[in-house]
Regions:
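Stable alpha-helical elements in mature extracytoplasmic
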Residues: 14, 64, 81, 100, ...
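Short sequence/structural elements of tandem HEAT/ARM alpha-solenoid repeats
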Residues: 79-83, 119, 235-239
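Short, mixed-charge aromatic SLiMs
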Residues: 13-28, 88-99, 124-137, 208-218, ...
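Acidic catalytic motifs of isoprenoid enzymes
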Residues: 1-61
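Accessory "access/gating" subregions that flank catalytic or transport cores
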Residues: 36-58, 67-78, 86-91, 106-210
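Acidic, carboxylate-rich catalytic segments that either coordinate divalent cations
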Residues: 135-177, 227-304
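Catalytic phosphate/nucleotide-handling subdomain of diverse soluble enzymes
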Residues: 92-96, 103-105, 109, 187-270
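Structural helix-adjacent loops and short alpha-helical linkers that scaffold large soluble proteins
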Residues: 2-10, 77-78, 113-119, 195-201, ...
């Protein structure tokens, strides 16, 4: 649920407001989100609520699949996006789980001001500490994409052999089930690189890589949508969205249509707060050079 006030930067920047709304919302949560809700309701506040000592799902995909909006309201302002990720992402994730959201937010932000997918993938990665497992995994995706530019399956197999292990999520440790942020981020990047700007191919590859295979194509296609714009989305994909745009999400007063308005309002606020301008229907932004986020404290097992 959004707080009752009209959407503004103040709401995002007021951590206590976000924490309270997150913990007390009526809708169900799972994994890192649910553990964080439990923690907050029992007095363990962010960032401790997302820390691996208190949250066994700290490396899960939760923040990674929620960070899209952060990049979308920060056009070209990759470091501003990272600052928002720090406030929001540490509610439920930490370490590699947090880096996943930072990275996706960075790619969305850069997608406004870059048309080249490789540039977006590599520039966004500059926000992530090189010592992290997450960084190493995405570097491997880029490496094997270059080695096998025409066969995503060979790249997938290399990544599977090196990075498809689950060491955190209790439901996934002894099963094939894996919602680790790192491996699923790799599948998003594979979809983008091998999809080469084609919406169907991007979603198809990100889906067929497996694991969290509804979220990954959604993330990859979302980034592609920012690069190319709404008009470039093939008509085939639009009717299903249009039919549900005005349906309210369960336990909220928010529909997809209202989300569009909320995000545009937030984008306008972020733009003005960072030296950008709005003249009529034209938006002028400030382009930031990516800065590396400080390294979260990692588990000993993350050094493997």
């Amino acid at each position: 649920n959004m707080p009752p006030e009209s959407p503004s930067l103040a709401i995002i920047e007021a951590s206590s407001t976000i924490n309270k709304a997150f913990a007390n919302a009526d809708y169900k949560l799972w994994h890192a989100n649910q553990a964080a809700r439990y923690n907050i309701l029992h007095g363990i506040m962010p960032p401790a609520s997302g820390h691996w000592k208190n949250n066994p799902h700290a490396d899960d995909i939760d923040f990674q699949i929620e960070a899209d909006f952060i990049g979308m309201i920060c056009p070209g302002m990759v470091n501003t996006a990272s600052n928002f990720s720090d406030k929001i992402g540490h509610i439920m994730n930490y370490g590699d789980g947090w880096y996943g959201g930072v990275y996706m937010g960075a790619m969305y932000a850069l997608a406004y001001v870059n048309n080249d997918i490789y540039t977006i993938v590599t520039e966004a990665l500059k926000t992530i500490p090189e010592q992290s497992k997450f960084h190493r995994c995405i570097i491997d995706v880029i490496k094997y994409w270059k080695q096998y530019p025409d066969d995503w399956r060979k790249c997938w197999l290399e990544i599977e052999n090196r990075h498809a292990f689950e060491i955190g999520c209790p439901e996934g440790v002894f099963n094939a089930f894996n919602i680790d942020a790192t491996i699923n981020a790799a599948y998003c990047v594979m979809g983008l690189l091998y999809g080469n700007g084609d919406f169907f191919k991007t979603m198809d590859i990100a889906t067929r890589c497996g694991q969290d295979s509804d979220c990954n194509p959604a993330t990859a296609a979302g980034i592609l949508g920012v690069i190319q714009g709404y008009k470039a989305i093939p008509e085939y994909w639009k009717p299903a969205l249009e039919r549900c745009e005005n349906i309210k999400f369960p336990y909220t007063d928010i529909s997809l249509s209202s989300v569009y308005d909320i995000n545009l309002k937030l984008l306008s606020d972020v733009l003005k707060a960072n030296g950008g301008k709005i003249k009529g229907d034209k938006y002028y932004t400030t382009i930031q050079k990516p800065k590396t986020e400080k390294k979260d404290t990692l588990k000993e097992t993350d050094t493997r």
